[in-house]
Amino acid sequence: MTSARPFPAFMGVFVLLLSLTSWIPAYGQAHRENYDDTDPWIGVRLETRGPDSAAVAGFVGALAASDPAVCQFAVTSIGNYWNHGDDEFPTGNLKDEETQEARRQTLSRPVSDPAAIALLVQSLGSAQPCVRRAAARMLGRGREPEPVRQLRSALRTGDSRVREAAALGLGDAEDPGAFHDLARALKDKDVAVVRMAAYALGELEDARAVKPLEDLLRADDPDTRATAAVALGEIEDIRATDRLGPLVRDREIRVRLAAVNALGEIEDHRATGALIEALRDKDVRVRRAAAEALGEVENPGAAGALAQALEDGDLVVRRLAAQALGELDNLKRAPARLVAALADPDSELRTIAAMSLGEIGDSTAVPALTKAYVGAEPRLRYGIVKALAETDDRRGDAVLALAAQDKDQAIRHTAAEALKDRRDDDDDDD
């Protein structure tokens, strides 16, 4: 009698999981506006048959028999857009690859078989969290009407574990019809269900969810506050700015991070003050997130705080601050600290500073840029050339002429283009 080998058996099925999101659409894509484009697959119906109950049972059973960490890794990979198409290697003696590929393609399609749907719905109540989540995501990600209907029904069941899993599946489905079901779930007595419903509403990106999600920002549970903040960031509605701002002072690091990231996603200038405050947070993770978020908000009023952050004790904060300065709207003058960063010991910061100076286009930085070119590494030379090309200050012409003879092709090309543009401008003036 041969002994069972659950781990190898699981890995055979796990191969199928790696691209569950690479479902092929039912028809070839429509023509684009470019009439030169042709597509032999236009109007051709492609294979759409999803897994039957036997395939689903084998997959779920393999997950249940696996190590919990491996199972969770597998479930996380559902929906992360891993594409199996880049791994077309010869099978050689690995004949099992051909069989697994055919099974993978079947599992990657939406589930429509009634028996398979019933098995997945039953698995929503599994004792193992990762099995519940796998079932929920397989039901939701296909966005087929019947699985979504089953998920909406499961959101009203008496088992809180099933309700939590159903909310996850509805988040993957992104079905606007589930909005009211998920909004009601925000008042669930089980906090895990509330958190998952908040997550799902963020995935729907429905502005109607702003008010109920804002109410969760006052929840006693920090994970609920953080999840609500993340969801509001996904929706990107500026009405949430004022309610998210105070959370940059929350006692929990995960809540502060979620609020800062959400404010960056919303890109409302009114968030500038809160993000500047977060730029001075004692936790380096918050400072990094704040620097990046200020670049996304693009308010030139943050220039002073970002310039000050160029002296932060953390290298990543300094780099992000330098980058953010180049992203601010209509910043007329380059901060002196950004210009000074051209001589920073860190080569990446030097390059970022040069690129940002190019975005700002301040001619007062030209002398420092020309000085920094001599002896600079290739990436910095390229950044300097791009920066000089963005200004009308002709004091940079000598460096551009030198760069036009650089051994690096990208530098030569960029410098030559800049010099040509200047000659054309001179001809126009004449």
Name the predicted role of every residue range.
Residues 27-31:
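Boundary of Sec targeting at the N-terminus
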Residues 42-43, 74, 103, 135, ...:
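Conserved hydrophobic register position within alpha-solenoid helical repeats
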Residues 66-67, 127-128, 158-159, 189-191, ...:
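Short inter-helical turns and helix N-cap capping residues of alpha-solenoid HEAT/ARM repeat scaffolds
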Residues 52-62, 84-125, 144-156, 175-187, ...:
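Amphipathic alpha-helical scaffolding segments comprising HEAT/armadillo-like alpha-solenoid repeats
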Residues 11-22:
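Bacterial N-terminal signal peptides
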Residues 2-13:
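Bacterial N-terminal signal peptides that target proteins for export
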